């Protein structure tokens, strides 16, 4: 150990600077000297390693809403869904208007009379059985059309004391003629006839007995002679009367 310490001290003496003013350097450190002049910048060193990842920053403020994209293609048709339950019953609606078809009908009979009627003139049936619309005039025996359409007219006559021939007349023209011979029988006979005809407003229809001796229409308490008519169907929708 001692030889090693002696060698170490020898090395320190031989490597130390020359003695100044014959002073032996002290083994104790002195006061620090003045800072030296800064050295030149050295060359750039090698790049250092990447540092550790930093912590996540705070969320940024929401950006402005962008423009909508183009509509996509229609998707495939889905399966039908289950049938829904029936909804509640709705409120009752207001009553609608009910269209009533036009009407026209009458029936009348002759009063008791044993006097033969005049020929070639309208024959009055003065006792009204039905005439709700007032289209038949019992004083003249004429029916005047107010509702255009097709009508049916019928006459049922009692024949007594003479043969009878009568016509259904429209506006002065015979549309049907009927005859019953009377052979002097003790009891009355009967004669019936009818026809359908189309009428326009203000057309008139009546019964008229024939000329000569064929005027044997009769009416009494037990036997009647009647004239009736009624509308079968109407052309009211296309008539100016209802425009």
From Swiss-Prot:
Q: Which residues form the C1q domain?
A: 99-238
Sorted UniProt keywords: Collagen, Secreted, Signal
Query: What Pfam families does this protein's entry cite?
Result: C1q, Collagen
Q: Where is the signal peptide?
A: 1-15
Q: Which GO terms describe its molecular function?
A: identical protein binding
Biological process (GO) annotations held by this record are: inner ear development; protein secretion
InterPro entries in the record, alphabetically?
A: C1q_dom, Collagen, Collagen/C1q_domain, Tumour_necrosis_fac-like_dom
Where in the cell? Secreted
Q: Is the keyword Iron-sulfur in the record?
A: no
Q: List cystine links.
A: none
Q: Which residues form the Collagen-like domain?
A: 30-95
- Give me the ranges of the annotated region Disordered: 15-124
The organism sits in which domain of life? Answer: Eukaryota
Protein's UniProt keywords contain Zinc: no
Subunit: Homotrimer (via collagen-like domain). May form higher order oligomers by supercoiling of the trimers. May interact with ERFE.
What this protein is called in its record is Complement C1q tumor necrosis factor-related protein 5
